[in-house]
Amino acid sequence: MKNSKNFSVRKIALGASSTLLATLIAANGMGLANAAETHHHSEHQQTISPNSQKLAKKAQSKMAINNNNYMDQNFDLRKRCFALVGAAEDTHLNYHDNYGSFSGDIGDPRGITAGITGFTTETGDMKPMLDYYHQISPGNPLDQDRDHLKHVSESDLKAHWKDAYDNDTDNFIKAQNHQVKSDDMDVAVKYAKKDHLSQLGQYIYFDALVKHGPGKSNSNNPEDWSFGDLRSRAKAKAKTPAQGGDESTYLNNFVGQRYDSIGKENADNPDMDSDGTFDRLKFQQEELAKEDWDLKLPLDFHMNGKHFILTQDMINGFSDKDLASLN
């Protein structure tokens, strides 16, 4: 739900070495495995020690990452991530409609909430988005609101938001994407690559950034935690794959930190839908338990109490144009 963004800082047939190569496939995709197989055939056959899997994990931190795991280069993954976040934020898979969503004032300290990832009037992400929107579309319907967002009436902002979405759609989507790329997508890609995460891990990071915001508060209060706090606390308990750790163990720790953060916020806000806000985390834990590292479709899940099935046909039907400006 659009209620937790924290901007306190800002907001196998593989030959004799099959065990090793299977591990490399799981960690890095077929490209790395093929490279390892080529190298193997250029050497004499050798016996794999009982510690081969452990050695493969250590080698993983020194080898090239699989760029197919990240939204900056894998467009289909980008569409899957936006659909899943859309289900969590707006209970709607088709992200095109979510650019026009308007949740309003939901009773938290963030003011009025609207847009693809829940821009808010009090946290600092709606204003720069509207400033960029003004740059690319001066005189747009929201120009009259951008300099006094903390005092604008909800009804006026809602009407102007709808006008922008209905009548200046391409520019309005481009402006929202500009902010999402800066605050969420680029940060998710950066740290997912740094930690050598899978496609599933990339999605988990992106969802956390949308929900909790970028930056780091260094607060002991879980309610104040941003993405940087969640990641540092998870790393304190488990090594990332780049450090030679197990991805499932690390990401389960990361999701566990999110449970603590969201749970504390729900406890302090009795009107919050606790079950609904935890659905996104339950889904992530289910995919981790399945070891669905490539986030394969179809995906069958519940979000905000609603049942969804996300298929490849649906992804193919969702707009490519909407997400192109994130390149």
Model-derived regions: residue spans:
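Bacterial Sec-dependent N-terminal signal peptides
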Residues: 1-16, 31-34, 40-46
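Hydrophobic core
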Residues: 20-28
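Generic secondary-structure boundary signal with a strong preference for alpha-helix termini
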Residues: 27, 31, 127-130
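Cell-wall polysaccharide-cleaving catalytic domain and substrate-binding groove, primarily
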Residues: 36-195, 200-327
